[in-house]
Amino acid sequence: MLSANAKVKVQNFGRFLSNMVMPNIGAFIAWGFITALFIPTGWLPNETLAKLVGPMITYLLPLLIGYSGGKLIAGERGAVVGAIATAGVIVGTDIPMFLGAMIAGPTGGWAIKRFDKWADGKIKSGFEMLVNNFSSGIIGMILAILFFWLIGPAVKALSTMLAAGVDILVKAHLLPLTSIFVEPAKILFLNNAINHGIFSPLGIQQSQEFGQSIFFLIEANPGPGLGVLLAYIIFGKGTAKQTAGGATIIHFFGGIHEIYFPYVLMNPRLLLAVIAGGVSGVFTLVLFNAGLVAPASPGSIIAVLLMTPQNAIVGVLASVAIAATVSFVIASFFLKIQKEENGHSLEKMQAASKAMKSGVQFNTPARYQGVQKIFVACDAGMGSSAMGASMLRKKVKEAGLAIEVTNCAINDLPEDAQLVITHQDLTLRAKKHTPNAMHFSLNNFLDAHFYDNLVQDLSNTKVADLAKVSTLEPQEAPQTAFVLTEKQVFLGLKAANKEEAIRFAGERLVESGFVLPSYVDAMFEREKMVSTYLGEGIAVPHGTIEAKDAVLKTGVVVCQYPEGVKFNEDEEDSIAKLVIGIAAKNNEHLQVVSAITNALDNEDAIRILSETDDVEKVLALLKA
């Protein structure tokens, strides 16, 4: 059995692969449709439009994967360097390089991230843009050349090895076991050497002698891929589940097997499903003594049936059906396990949070030795985490601890972070950025009991000289006070649902000149990730971190809903009476955030903010 730490690493690796592939699944679907329609054996053959097929699978798709991989490691700079490195992989070989892209992209991101860390603080003022551009260009060039020279020989060696393995099994009359080599080779686009070097010559010879050949269907059987896609349709989640239906049509009826490759690449355990499906399919063909009279191209069920002799129809259909069934069962098992693992992780986080609330210390005080800084992180580092950090900072100050408490976006967490607090739905993502930090999960950033217990543990550890009372404010403390005016306060509102409330807050931010109209859409995108309801009747809708370019200047609008607005359908007590729309350029809005968290200590203040019809009272409380 894998240890808990090993399981987390496997899960994180799987999520990383998925995050490289899934943003680009639309491009795979587009390529699949173009291929199925316009190639010579497609539904609408078109010589001109068919020219799109080769460049898209050779260049576009690997570049997109490399770009996404680099971006996951080091943002936009990592994406650019990752794409440059991937170009070296593409040119270094004559087959589509998905696997190479999944290596080159993150490598490019890692390289530029290491350089940026080394260069931090060493660049003279005024030379930042010059150094940034040239560093990414030079590092990208070096990696592209390196991958160009390395990838060709590596691919050739791997292809030769797979072909040799198949040849040994064929000569030993162990045909079903050839799928152990064939299915992984298909996923990596290394099947040409097997097809053209072994299966085609043997298939032609056997077909001339017996009128059919099993070798024509070992690689072309659509069953294994069909099983995986059906498993995603039923047990998948997110974009993978939503797109699997269209991919199934392209794969099974269009014969474009490449369309299911990304679904396996992002979850490598599914290789076992397609291998088992392939083995069972070939075994069925041997059992029924079935085969095709000629190669089926493309490998759709229609082309397969057209190449099937009358006496082999039952065997071929049984082969496809059994291969699909076996692949489906095994893929479903792995996808269900993945869901359960994620669910168990969430349950553990929730249990930990409840333990904190009840006063149970689930981390020994010794673990806090040396902690000097605490990060409260959320997706954008703007609203939710700012509130939590403000509340925790106040408690740390009252305890006399010399510990800095700051909020930030998860993507901005430093590698050397010691202690990180996130919403339970974002903890796994935070762990990817800072795997060596202590991570705490909560489901309410305004959970005072959580912070009380944490501060108590920190105090017991004596992490700092208690004689030195120092509450460190965020490094980017505002230079000028943020001004909240009566034009930014809206009282006595009503909304049928949270969407209305969020849109109202967003439109007021636009009207006040704080943001561009596109920021409103980003507020809805942020809400889809994790609810911005904080608890205590307060919600702080704001945009995603990608939407910061749409922020013209820092602004806050306070919207009061005396009758309340339900923010989480599955939580009865998630009724927000204060909906505070936030757009932050820097940290000027923290003044209002701090005032709100201070008001939480006073039940009368929260009641007044939620019910008063006097704007001046609201301003007085939030300016306190």
From Swiss-Prot:
Its main location: membrane. Residues 482-624 form the PTS EIIA type-2 domain. InterPro entries: PTrfase/Anion_transptr (IPR016152), PTS_EIIA_type-2_dom (IPR002178), PTS_EIIB-like_sf (IPR036095), PTS_EIIB_2 (IPR013011), PTS_EIIB_2/3 (IPR003501), PTS_EIIB_mannitol (IPR029503), PTS_EIIC (IPR003352), PTS_EIIC_2 (IPR013014). GO terms for cellular component: plasma membrane. The keyword Nucleotide-binding does not apply. Induction: Induced by mannitol. Repressed by MltR. This is PTS system mannitol-specific EIICBA component. Keywords: Cell inner membrane, Cell membrane, Kinase, Membrane, Phosphoprotein, Phosphotransferase system, Sugar transport, Transferase, Transmembrane, Transmembrane helix, Transport. The active site is at C378 (phosphocysteine intermediate), H542 (tele-phosphohistidine intermediate).
